[in-house]
């Protein structure tokens, strides 16, 4: 049985698109996991910083002026880190949304390519069946 060149080419194009989108989906999923992991690590780091830099009167009361100054400087550093954390968190949220969108788009394209491949196979099988019936 010979497959018509048009069907064969269409199948190969759909197969290549499927493979390409499968790779794109895998990359998007990997990037998504990476961003989410970094977000969790940053949240944990911020919890630690917040715990070390509390400026409650109880904490400050037992310290001499040098210790209080150091504690205030640490709190200022923590405040800067906290601002950076929230900016990074917003950037990470945008990246998460981007990678989720890219993964969904790749999955949609994979599904379309799969339908084209299935259609090509069905068409070839149908033609083979029709050809076999007319020969018999």
Locations of regions flagged by a protein language model:
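Short, charge-rich amphipathic alpha-helices with coiled-coil/heptad character
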Residues: 1-30
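Extended alpha-helical coiled-coil "stalk/arm" regions
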Residues: 32-74
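Short, glycine/alanine-rich amphipathic alpha-helical segment
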Residues: 60-95
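C-terminal alpha-helix/helix-terminus motif
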Residues: 121-124, 128
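Short acidic DE-rich linear segments
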Residues: 129-136
């Amino acid at each position: 049985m010979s497959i018509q060149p048009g069907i064969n080419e269409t199948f190969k194009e759909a197969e290549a698109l499927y493979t390409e989108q499968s790779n794109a989906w895998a990359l998007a999923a990997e990037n998504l996991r990476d961003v989410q992991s970094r977000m969790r690590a940053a949240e944990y780091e911020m919890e630690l910083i917040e715990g070390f830099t509390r400026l409650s009167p109880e904490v400050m009361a037992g310290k001499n002026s040098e210790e209080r100054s150091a504690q205030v400087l640490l709190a200022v550093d923590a405040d800067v880190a906290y601002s950076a954390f929230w900016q990074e968190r917003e950037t990470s949220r945008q990246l998460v949304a981007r990678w989720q969108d890219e993964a969904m788009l790749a999955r949609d394209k994979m599904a379309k390519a799969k339908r084209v491949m299935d259609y090509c196979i069905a068409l070839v099988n149908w033609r083979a069946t029709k050809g076999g019936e007319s020969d018999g």
